[in-house]
Amino acid sequence: MKSVGAFVRERRRANQMSQHALAELAGVSQPFISELERGKPTVRLDAVNRVLAVFGKQVGVVDAPRPEVHP
């Protein structure tokens, strides 16, 4: 599975966009784009979703198998 940062970098380059141009479109700073692409952890899901929205994507919550709990 590809990381969010790797996805953003790949899509940005495929669209021949600079980090600055993507930041302007998404309403975030260029350093935020740089940090996101490098995989720096963030709790700013609102900002991550604004970046992903430029490419028609978003972060969401999906059901996952629950780990078995042994008392």
Model-assigned labels for residue ranges:
Residues R66-P71:
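Helix-turn-helix/homeodomain-like alpha-helical modules used for DNA recognition
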Residues M1-S3:
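A detector for short, charged/polar N-terminal pre-domain segments
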